Swiss-Prot record:
Pfam families: Ribosomal_L13e. One of its GO terms (molecular function) is RNA binding. Its main location: cytoplasm. Belongs to the eukaryotic ribosomal protein eL13 family. It comes from Danio rerio. PANTHER family: 60S RIBOSOMAL PROTEIN L13, LARGE RIBOSOMAL SUBUNIT PROTEIN EL13. Keywords: Cytoplasm, Ribonucleoprotein, Ribosomal protein. Component of the ribosome, a large ribonucleoprotein complex responsible for the synthesis of proteins in the cell. The small ribosomal subunit (SSU) binds messenger RNAs (mRNAs) and translates the encoded message by selecting cognate aminoacyl-transfer RNA (tRNA) molecules. The large subunit (LSU) contains the ribosomal catalytic site termed the peptidyl transferase center (PTC), which catalyzes the formation of peptide bonds, thereby polymerizing the amino acids delivered by tRNAs into a polypeptide chain. The keyword Cytoplasm applies. GO terms for biological process: embryonic cranial skeleton morphogenesis; regulation of cell cycle; translation. This is Large ribosomal subunit protein eL13.
Length: 211
């Protein structure tokens, strides 16, 4: 077996007929063709729906190390769907992924995904189940003629980077300790309840002493 990760480099002493036991991967080119054919078959099967699957939300990666990066998530929260005015059962039928476990921890993320859903609804073309009897909300015949299968990702996420002009670094910025400030803010948030409880107990003790 080939060495993996950061382990000890092996020094195996082969005595048996080891050439027979060598793991080979000669099936990879055929696998590549098989995967491609499967993708094409799926695209034909789900047409005219998008090839890449349903619409995904914009989420931030977890942990301090990666939370500056934005990527596509698993599904929209029930809160986001409610704010956008979309039923959670209907959402799955019109190509919107739903994740009931995810929670919105900020107003910004909620607003961004609600806006994404609303924009998606404006671009969406819904085919009637029965062509002779179109229901309310189904697209018109002119829109249906314009419909084509989307090959790329649905509403790709754009990573925007604001470029700042060169300027002189101020003395306050030089003295500012970013990591220490973040740690202090996290500590204050963590100890907020404990400190409030201690302050309340201290105030009660002062009142009792005065009596």
């Amino acid at each position: 077996m080939a060495p993996s990760r950061n382990g000890m480099i092996l020094n195996p002493h082969f005595h048996k007929d080891w050439q027979k036991r060598v793991r080979t991967w000669f099936n990879q080119p055929a696998r590549k063709i098989r995967r491609r054919k499967a993708r094409q078959a799926k695209a034909r099967r789900i047409a005219p729906r998008p090839v890449s699957g349903p619409l995904r939300p914009v989420v931030r990666c977890p942990t301090i190390r990666y939370h500056t990066k934005v990527r596509a998530g698993r599904g929209f929260t029930l809160e986001e769907l409610k704010a956008a005015g979309i039923n959670k059962k209907v959402a799955r039928t019109i190509g919107i992924s739903v994740d009931s476990r995810r929670r919105n921890r900020s107003t910004e993320s909620l607003q961004a995904n609600v806006q994404r859903l609303k924009e998606y609804r404006t671009k969406l073309i819904i085919f009637p189940r029965k062509a002779a009897k179109p229901k309310k909300g189904d697209s018109t015949e002119e829109e249906l003629k314009m419909a084509t299968q989307l090959t790329g990702p649905v509403m790709p996420i754009k990573k925007v980077h604001k470029k700042e002009k060169a300027r002189v670094i101020s003395e306050d910025e030089k003295n500012f300790k970013a990591f220490a400030s973040l740690r202090m803010a996290r500590a204050n948030a963590r100890l907020f309840g404990i400190r409030a409880k201690r302050a309340k107990e201290a105030a009660e003790q002062d009142v009792e002493k005065k009596k």
